């Protein structure tokens, strides 16, 4: 449930927060982390802009492998995770194990999930693509390498679709629109990642975005020449180039940035949109 603030100041006029999701992590499932997400490399040079600051965070250990096989677990809590835009669930398994997983859309407290090779095709269950999973099934948290854990479709609202099976491979349509092959032995979780409307929630003020570690975005044309190729000039000057560029001088707005001659090129049937 989205809770709108009572308007007492201009900054709370348009702000919204989820009133049903709290953050009360278990001590054995968290650990401290060095806050290195400031967009700098080892030399202190900015390599990714608009990052820095933010509130201190504790890292939640998420079970992306789902290797608690054939043991049913119950959803005990649905919690906020400051390290991702998706919610997480605390699972109590029948053998006493407690783990966090990504919250599947529609899952509520008290639901039961299980992972294995012979489990039902229902929301939140994790199973290999080689099972009787029908074509068109919505999945998330998909493995690329067997046993490494889910790496694809993990963001809030992300969902991929199983569109074909042939030989030792399965064909998936990923959230980006890319169509690629994955080994059928890799596992995936049935359903869509929760918190679908995260991109529609209004933060209400600039300070709320600063708490998330996101710095203001500034146009290059208003910078100095030392800071951006578009900078400099007298008054409102044009960028002085035929085409826009990045802060490092590379062509911007549509240039392909993927490295060439990667092994996975042979597995990609259609590039992302």
Swiss-Prot record:
It is found in: Plastid, Chloroplast. GO terms for molecular function: rRNA binding; structural constituent of ribosome; transferase activity. Residues 1-14 have a biased composition (Polar residues). The keyword Ribonucleoprotein applies. Keywords: Chloroplast, Plastid, Ribonucleoprotein, Ribosomal protein. GO terms for cellular component: chloroplast; mitochondrial large ribosomal subunit. The keyword Transferase does not apply. InterPro entries: NA-bd_OB-fold, Rib_uL2_dom2, Ribosomal_uL2, Ribosomal_uL2_bac/org-type, Ribosomal_uL2_C, Ribosomal_uL2_CS, Ribosomal_uL2_dom3, Ribosomal_uL2_RNA-bd_dom. Residues 1-25, 224-273 are annotated as: Disordered. Pfam families: Ribosomal_L2, Ribosomal_L2_C. PROSITE patterns: RIBOSOMAL_L2. It comes from the Eukaryota. GO terms for biological process: mitochondrial translation. Part of the 50S ribosomal subunit. NCBIfam families: rplB_bact. Belongs to the universal ribosomal protein uL2 family. PANTHER family: LARGE RIBOSOMAL SUBUNIT PROTEIN UL2M, RIBOSOMAL PROTEIN L2. This is Large ribosomal subunit protein uL2cz. It comes from Liriodendron tulipifera (Tuliptree). The gene is rpl2-A.
């Amino acid at each position: 449930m989205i809770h709108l603030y009572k308007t007492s100041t201009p900054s709370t006029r348009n702000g919204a927060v989820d009133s049903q999701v709290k953050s009360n992590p278990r001590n054995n499932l968290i650990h401290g982390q060095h806050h290195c997400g400031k967009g700098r490399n080892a030399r202190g040079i900015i390599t990714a802009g608009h990052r820095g600051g933010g509130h201190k965070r504790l890292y939640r250990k998420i079970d992306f492998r789902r290797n608690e096989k054939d043991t049913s677990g119950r959803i005990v809590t649905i919690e906020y995770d400051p390290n991702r835009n998706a919610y997480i669930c605390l699972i109590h398994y029948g053998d006493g194990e407690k783990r966090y997983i990504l919250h599947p859309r529609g899952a509520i407290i008290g639901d039961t999930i299980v992972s294995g090779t012979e489990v039902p095709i229902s929301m939140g269950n994790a199973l290999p693509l080689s099972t009787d999973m029908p074509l068109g099934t919505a999945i998330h948290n998909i493995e690329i390498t067997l046993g490494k854990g889910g790496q694809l479709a993990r963001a809030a609202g992300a969902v991929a679709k199983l569109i074909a099976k042939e030989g030792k491979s399965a064909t998936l349509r990923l959230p980006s629109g890319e169509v690629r092959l994955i080994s059928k032995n890799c596992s995936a979780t049935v359903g869509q990642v929760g918190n679908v409307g995260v991109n529609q929630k209004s933060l209400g003020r600039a300070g709320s975005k600063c708490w998330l570690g996101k710095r203001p975005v500034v146009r290059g044309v208003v910078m100095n020449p030392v800071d951006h190729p578009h900078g400099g000039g007298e008054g409102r000057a044009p960028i002085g180039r035929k085409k826009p560029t990045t802060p490092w001088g590379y062509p911007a707005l549509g240039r392909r940035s993927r490295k060439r001659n990667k092994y996975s090129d042979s597995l990609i049937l259609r590039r992302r949109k």
